[in-house]
UniProtKB/Swiss-Prot annotation:
Dipeptidyl peptidase that cleaves off N-terminal dipeptides from proteins having a Pro or Ala residue at position 2. Acts as a key inhibitor of caspase-1-dependent monocyte and macrophage pyroptosis in resting cells by preventing activation of NLRP1 and CARD8. Sequesters the cleaved C-terminal part of NLRP1 and CARD8, which respectively constitute the active part of the NLRP1 and CARD8 inflammasomes, in a ternary complex, thereby preventing their oligomerization and activation. GO terms for molecular function: aminopeptidase activity; dipeptidyl-peptidase activity; identical protein binding; serine-type peptidase activity. Its EC number is 3.4.14.5. One of its GO terms (cellular component) is microtubule. It catalyses: Release of an N-terminal dipeptide, Xaa-Yaa-|-Zaa-, from a polypeptide, preferentially when Yaa is Pro, provided Zaa is neither Pro nor hydroxyproline. Detected in kidney, skin, brain, thymus and liver (at protein level). PANTHER family: DIPEPTIDYL PEPTIDASE 9 (PTHR11731:SF109), PROTEASE FAMILY S9B,C DIPEPTIDYL-PEPTIDASE IV-RELATED (PTHR11731). This is Dipeptidyl peptidase 9. Homodimer. Forms a ternary complex with NLRP1, composed of a DPP9 homodimer, one full-length NLRP1 protein, and one cleaved C-terminus of NLRP1 (NACHT, LRR and PYD domains-containing protein 1, C-terminus). Forms a ternary complex with CARD8, composed of a DPP9 homodimer, one full-length NLRP1 protein, and one cleaved C-terminus of CARD8 (Caspase recruitment domain-containing protein 8, C-terminus). In the ternary complex, only one subunit of the DPP9 homodimer is bound to NLRP1 or CARD8.
Amino acid sequence: MCSGVSPVEQVAAGDMDDTAARFCVQKHSWDGLRSIIHGSRKSSGLIVSKAPHDFQFVQKPDESGPHSHRLYYLGMPYGSRENSLLYSEIPKKVRKEALLLLSWKQMLDHFQATPHHGVYSREEELLRERKRLGVFGITSYDFHSESGLFLFQASNSLFHCRDGGKNGFMVSPMKPLEIKTQCSGPRMDPKICPADPAFFSFINNSDLWVANIETGEERRLTFCHQGSAGVLDNPKSAGVATFVIQEEFDRFTGCWWCPTASWEGSEGLKTLRILYEEVDESEVEVIHVPSPALEERKTDSYRYPRTGSKNPKIALKLAELQTDHQGKIVSSCEKELVQPFSSLFPKVEYIARAGWTRDGKYAWAMFLDRPQQRLQLVLLPPALFIPAVESEAQRQAAARAVPKNVQPFVIYEEVTNVWINVHDIFHPFPQAEGQQDFCFLRANECKTGFCHLYRVTVELKTKDYDWTEPLSPTEDEFKCPIKEEVALTSGEWEVLSRHGSKIWVNEQTKLVYFQGTKDTPLEHHLYVVSYESAGEIVRLTTLGFSHSCSMSQSFDMFVSHYSSVSTPPCVHVYKLSGPDDDPLHKQPRFWASMMEAANCPPDYVPPEIFHFHTRADVQLYGMIYKPHTLQPGRKHPTVLFVYGGPQVQLVNNSFKGIKYLRLNTLASLGYAVVVIDGRGSCQRGLHFEGALKNQMGQVEIEDQVEGLQYVAEKYGFIDLSRVAIHGWSYGGFLSLMGLIHKPQVFKVAIAGAPVTVWMAYDTGYTERYMDVPENNQQGYEAGSVALHVEKLPNEPNRLLILHGFLDENVHFFHTNFLVSQLIRAGKPYQLQIYPNERHSIRCRESGEHYEVTLLHFLQEHL
């Protein structure tokens, strides 16, 4: 049996006997600390993340030309402060002995993409928050490879340009063309119609529109917005992902073009379709967050569903438009499901993902129930949608016209008693004509507790339905029998599926390329396996680094953005070569470099990764930044930097000198810095992450304290009487938990933007991990730090709270409520507010102030 008090607590409870062994951090003035931060930021500018991303390979058809591909991407050219559209030419031949550094070529001529003074519309600013975007300029683009059309948002407008396609490839930068509009307000989420690139869709004032790039014609397809600017008057939207869907499910769109068109009537009219989500938030609570225009004493209003309260009502609909030979829109029609969405799918709370099969025969969607423990993958034939009409008689007539064998198909189901981590990995194969079988690739975490790839074949069995009669579907009403399910990967490791991870499927060679952690949970690698005869898994990237890869459409090349804790990011292009009769074993050959690793700042010392076993025999990983002024026998003040929540992994073999540069700054001043991924962090399987289920804040600190004990014993320079705990968001929440439950371990806590009462956080996140409040009252109370302030220490200068006043994610209410409770309990605290910041600190001056505040608080009070 373990004793009630850990060795960490025993040592930390009293002062160290030998004060001479203490290393004391040199105290600097406020201006002195500012100079230190300026210096670290200046040197970090040399390695700041200017790496290219969002790659598109296009093969060049000229067999006699010197280049095989043109590679498009977003990047920040040298000397620029904003992202732009760039390209590089990939040569057909390279000299083995020479390092070929590809030049980054500007696609756009003298183009400023950032709005004047960096002022974005409210919609763009909030989307940047949800996507955690810090860069300016062009941050995304849509591309139609056959026509060479690029479409992107910039300077509060939309622009397009062409390269490749029938017009050939440009040789010098071009002026992008602005797409004029009659709409007021920003045009969000622009998408090219894959079946006819003359058309594109966009969202304006919460409604779905289409426009013709060539003629300028615009057509509003939905009519949810009532014309008033107020949130209260406009609860409905079409084609827009709500706050919770963006923030908690990583879905940033609510509309999807059908990839094919159909021709109808004697005039040969072309029909184009868009699947979209319609949302009604009229029963969702409205909250008021201070507006950036504070001097006007305004507030911004948001629909924000708090845990246990009502979510939006949702439905999937179709927008159809018919065009003539000149590309003129002849008509448009709004269609709804033959029976109400809530009747057909009564248990569905969230539409997690949606799209179309490549042949356009089916729309598909991933449906999730409210507890997020059951996911259904559903096919919806377009014939299941009928025109939205006012009269019941017309609706009945339209329903009667739907063939009886047209129905939804539930082709796959995932069920767990933990929670489902939503992801994008789904590849449907084209369905053979006249066949009932439907085959697809899917990643599933629920089967084994680790995310793996499966090839699934189902039979699309139909029943006869009278769609004029109300249907009360049974639990398995539309469920299709599974004929075959083959595991392509297996083991205690993960196929990467979250946060935008992709697979690339070569249907000619029957190979699937994916990223995973097969070799170590600390590194991401690119692998390939046959999906026809599942067997050997081949790794294509080099061990000792963590990689993020993009494959070419012809599967002959890939780009890897890779780094390690000691090597800043590189971006290299590789060519797969080998015999065509054995494509699985084609070897990657280094072809060219797009970016070489920059030199680290002279004072940068990479962290050291370690692992240890807890008393419960769970292996955990951590990393330590050793103090740069290390002297034998001296004990150093220590900062435990923590996140500790789900969906995040801090400890891995990737470069930390950009995002976490401040941890190196702390080490340069004489602090030891420790980071530990405890139970609840990701990339270790569902049950490791699921340790938090219904008990957030109750298991994480034990792992952190055991990690501190381990590093203190292993390294010998940790001063256990001078430990600070610091984190942001979930890390801010755990910093408070540490000081509440382990005040004898943590001398000070610095908590940034903490959730302090789970009852005030959103449905999608809180209920996934904590259930609804009525089912888990004890968990909610135990996990809400504001309800336990009496356990916080009575000594001043042990607690610092930081929060952005405009935070629309973890609302400032959390800090407000905590401070009220602290005052009521007579507890000391310090509070730093950032009046113009949201959940993440964006402004350079605010970021500098936060870092100086952190250093000053630590040097004075640790």
